[in-house]
Regions:
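Conserved PLP-binding catalytic core of the aspartate aminotransferase-like
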Residues: 267, 279-311
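PLP-dependent aminotransferase-like
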Residues: 6, 93-150
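Short acidic capping loops at alpha-helix termini that bridge into adjacent secondary structure
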Residues: 70-74, 95-98, 144, 181, ...
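Phosphate-binding glycine-rich loop
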Residues: 57-98, 116
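PLP-dependent aminotransferase class I/II
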Residues: 201-279, 286
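N-terminal "arm"/small-domain region of PLP-dependent enzymes with the aminotransferase-like
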Residues: 1-65
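PLP-dependent enzyme catalytic core of the Aspartate aminotransferase-like
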Residues: 164, 310-311, 320-348
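Active-site phosphate-binding strand-loop segment of PLP-dependent enzymes
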Residues: 128-187
Length: 348
């Protein structure tokens, strides 16, 4: 980070381009009683006949109040995958640059790298504690390494990356460090969004799909410095978050007490599930989890996966992931769902 220069990270063509200005961008601060005859919309009101706010200002304002972060430090997208893709397109030169990610981790990083013709370099976690291997990560960095992806809490392992480990990476890498915090609401650790002023080279992504319970509307949030946000707004599709998504997100986020109450129930249910797993004969190891799921090592993952499926319970078989041989990932369900799961555990 000592030599971090954003202008050297941005693709030259992106640095030079001008952002597309949509019809609603031009009048985003205008009075709502204007007659809009500029965007070739159907003028008859049905609640959705107008284009949505391209900057999602009302939704960002609520997120700003919840997170205590300026709206100028946000980009919203059609799920986290869209904002992650924006990062690749803004900063990585196809067929030239590379990115590094811990492994095992979220599979879309490699998919997006391949989609954007960017070399993807895996760094295996330490098998003993599922923490990043710093020596290995730093050995993989070269002059064309633009970004390091760190999912924390990590999927599928469930563990949060130790803060001193993340700090060492952020402070000693001159590119961008992307911290994926999809599961941060289930952890006691403080989010890295509150370090944006201290570290201009970090990008933090979050989602409404997990703790908030809005996976069906697809809404991802990216937090970064105002300079990085300005770059991403250049290339973001103007109406990438539709009006129905914005409306539903605002509706649910207004009752954050209810969201917190549900999160607390899930955390309690995770403890119940963990205790049941500890008493299960075919479970060989239960990995620590700061997320809403538990990764377990069993005697035969393929066999146990099929047995659960026969009982009508779908879990995730991670046995083909790096370092996850014979591992299953179980999402914490409702009390009723967990009871059915525990009943099945006891019957196998």
């Amino acid at each position: 980070m000592k030599n971090f220069n954003l202008n050297k990270i941005i693709r030259p063509n992106i640095l030079a381009m001008k952002a597309y200005s949509s019809a609603r961008d031009e009048f985003k601060d205008a009075s709502k009683d204007l007659i809009f005859l500029d965007a070739n919309e159907n003028p008859y009101n049905n609640g959705l006949n107008r284009y949505p706010d391209p900057q999602q200002r009302d939704l960002k304002q609520i997120l700003s109040q919840i997170k205590n972060i300026s709206t100028e430090n946000m980009v919203l997208g059609n799920g986290s995958d869209e904002v992650l893709d924006l990062i690749f397109r803004a900063f990585c030169e196809p067929n030239q640059d590379n990115v590094i990610s811990i492994s095992p981790s979220y599979g879309m990083y490699s998919v997006l790298a391949n989609l954007n013709a960017v070399e993807y370099r895996k760094s295996l976690l330490n098998i003993a504690d599922f923490q990043p291997n710093l020596d290995d990560i730093f050995s993989k960095i070269d002059t064309n390494t633009k970004m390091i992806f760190l999912c924390s809490p990590n999927n599928p392992t469930g563990e949060i990356i130790k803060r001193n480990t993340l700090t060492e990476i952020v402070e000693n890498f001159d590119g961008l460090v992307v911290i994926d915090e999809a599961y941060i609401d289930f952890s006691d650790e403080q989010s890295w969004i509150y370090e944006l002023e201290n570290y201009p080279n970090i990008i933090v992504t979050q989602t409404l799909s997990k703790a908030v319970g809005l996976a069906g509307i697809r809404l991802g949030i990216l937090y970064a410095s105002k300079e990085i946000i300005s770059v991403l707004n250049k290339i973001k599709p103007p109406y990438n978050v539709n009006q129905l998504t914005q409306n539903k997100a605002i509706e649910i986020l207004k009752d954050y007490e209810k969201i917190n109450a549900i999160m607390q129930v899930l955390i309690e249910q995770k403890a119940v599930l963990k205790q049941a797993l500890e008493n299960c004969s075919f479970v060989e190891k239960i990995y620590p989890s700061d997320a809403n799921f538990i990764l377990i090592k069993v005697d035969n993952a393929n066999k146990r996966y099929d047995e659960f499926l026969e009982k009508g319970i779908v879990i995730r078989n991670r046995t083909n992931d790096d370092l996850c041989e014979n591992c299953l990932r179980i999402t914490v369900g409702t009390e009723e769902e967990n009871s059915k799961l525990i009943e099945t555990l006891n019957s196998l």
